Design a protein with these regions (language model features):
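Helix-loop-helix hairpin linking two adjacent transmembrane segments in secondary transporters
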Residues: 115-169
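Helix-to-loop junctions at the C-terminal end of transmembrane segments
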Residues: 47-59, 242-254, 338
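A late C-terminal transmembrane helix in Major Facilitator Superfamily
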Residues: 307-343, 349-350
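Paired small-residue
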Residues: 74, 85-93, 280-288
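C-terminal transmembrane helical hairpin of 12-TM major facilitator-type secondary transporters
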Residues: 256-299
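Conserved MFS/SLC helix-loop-helix module at the cytosolic interface between two early adjacent transmembrane helices
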Residues: 46-82
């Protein structure tokens, strides 16, 4: 399941580093190519809220296998696309797969592992998601240079086959426990603690993705680092390190992680603004950024299992929808700021969003210990 999370989220964000070859090959603008991320995000939001309601009568194992098939079909369609419409149709399918599977993943995990192993299992599962957030763009760049952009997207097909076989072997039959309706999802927000938690996680992802997509132009133009160095640095060090230590942040008391991670990212963003012209300092700060980014989905999913242990499908659906919304809005507002006010304003925007997330997370973080 962690591998599937990694493959899905990597597929969503690989276009970040492949905009130019995609646009040149399919004869449309880089702006249109960039819409692929927003388009898949839109369908992920829709599917996370409505998809599992439509599949409410199906065994959850069957639903996961279905979403894996959809991912593989998406890879084939995107790889063979010869125009804008076909390319975006493939991107819509990957959004459906992401929204559906990701919203179910934590609820499924809680049902198939021993209660004492839930925190560790979530760290492994969401570690795949978190690692993909960091390494997908440089991985796409590396694969694009090696086998072309079509080859890069086609890698999801053999990866999907591996996931499919493994799912059939290890995931037992999981009959649906209850229907997940929009009314049920919305009712979760009546809890002040849960609502504040959702606001905090939304701001955390908005802050992250108002800055992350624009690290490449920042590093190339301000710091003077080449793209190969960027790829190796992010892929080989920051993302992997952050994933490996994600379990460290999943403690009885989640407050330090829920507040400290976004606060740390805010400090890094601020320091990049001041020291971005110094390659050594920038490299060290990016390492810290990668380490602090990857545990965020792990910690928030663990928090959710403590706050709403009996409503994880509904909670997972809402969290995925909000994260996808945050990614889209963060990238959009960061891009607008980058284009019209310059990179400094983008980094300051990210800093403000991350600080707000840290402050709002205080109360939900305190309650998580009480619920434990």
């Amino acid at each position: 399941m962690a591998l599937l999370c990694f493959v899905l989220v990597s597929s969503e964000f690989m276009p970040v580093s492949l905009l130019t070859p995609i646009a040149n090959d399919l004869s449309f603008t880089e702006g249109q190519a960039g819409q692929a991320i927003a388009f898949s995000g839109l369908f992920a939001v829709i599917t996370s809220l409505f998809g599992n309601t439509l599949l409410a009568r199906f065994d959850r194992r069957t639903a996961v296998i279905f979403y894996t098939f959809v991912m593989m079909i998406s890879g084939v369609i995107v790889t063979s696309a010869h125009g804008y419409g076909m390319f975006m149709f493939g991107r819509a399918l990957i959004g459906i797969s992401i929204g559906g599977f990701w919203s179910l993943s934590t609820a499924i995990l809680v049902r198939i592992v021993h209660p004492l192993s839930v925190p560790k299992a979530i760290a492994i599962l969401q570690g795949g998601t978190a690692l993909a957030f960091v390494v997908a763009p440089p991985l796409g760049s590396f694969l694009g240079n090696l086998i072309g952009w079509r080859g890069a997207f086609f890698t999801v097909v053999p990866a999907g086959v591996i996931c499919l076989i493994w799912q059939m072997v290890v995931i037992p039959k999981l009959p649906p426990q209850r229907d997940t309706s929009i009314r049920q999802i919305a009712s979760l927000l009546r809890s002040r603690i849960f609502a504040l938690g959702m606001i905090a996680v939304t701001l955390a992802f908005m802050g992250q993705f108002s800055l992350s997509p624009y690290l490449r132009p920042f590093l190339e133009c301000v710091t003077g680092l080449g793209i190969n160095m960027i790829s190796l640095f992010l892929l080989g060090v920051a993302g992997l390190t952050g994933t490996l230590i994600s379990g460290f942040f999943v403690r009885d008391n989640l407050l330090p992680a829920l507040t400290g991670l976004p606060a740390g990212l805010a400090i890094v963003a601020g320091l990049l603004t001041a020291l971005g012209h110094i390659p050594a300092a920038t490299g060290a700060l990016l390492l810290v950024w990668g380490i602090l980014v990857t545990p965020i989905p792990v910690v928030w999913n663990t928090w959710m299992t403590r706050i709403i242990p009996d409503e994880l499908e509904a909670g997972g659906a809402l969290m995925v929808a909000l994260i996808q919304f945050a990614i889209t809005m963060g990238a959009f507002t960061g891009g607008e700021s980058f284009d019209h006010q310059g990179w400094v304003s983008t980094f300051m925007l990210a800093t403000a969003l991350l600080v707000a997330s840290a402050i709002i997370a205080v109360l939900p973080g305190r309650r998580s210990l009480a619920e434990k």
